[in-house]
Amino acid sequence: MRDQKALSVRTVVAIGIGTAILFILKRFAVIPTGIANTNIDISYGFLGFIATLFGPIAGFFIGFLGHALNDFTQYGTPWWTWVFTTGLVGMVIGLFWRRFNVEAGNFGMKKIVSFNLLQIITNVVSWSLIAPTLDIWIYSEPANKVYVQGIVSAISNSIATGVIGTILLVTYAATRTRSGSLKKES
């Protein structure tokens, strides 16, 4: 008998559907920033939302696969350092899914602030430091180019996640029945 718990059907379905939605958003719902290969990308708001609902494994694979599919279909080959970093962003945000517990129907101001602090720190570290450094090590890209791209991405992804992700989480939580809200009538 297996000691490890396999991925649930719910998580696998979330990965499949989430990857498809992320791919569509990355492909068709972006605004160019004027910096090469850098966009204002609302898919990061969706990734923050879906990672908060389904956890780190789903967050990683949705980010990784959705970004890889977009790069493959748009450019012919994935830019693996940024694909990995997108997966990492989804995973880190997903690590806190139990803390946010959106399924309980409560995503108030305290959780909104916590979510946004988490996603800003995650986006800044991931896009300003990790992705550009990997670009230099793996692809021998010029440092000034990739760090500018990374900083612009950190800012735009933080804003997109802060606005879109927060709206999605608050709206979703409002559709859930709050725990303890149902009372037996006398």
Curated annotation (Swiss-Prot):
Transmembrane segments: 12-32, 45-65, 77-97, 112-132, 150-170
Cited Pfam families: ECF-ribofla_trS
Localization (cell): Cell membrane
CC annotations in GO: plasma membrane
Entry similarity comment: Belongs to the UPF0397 family.
NCBIfam families: PRK13661.1
Name recorded for this polypeptide: UPF0397 protein LCABL_04350
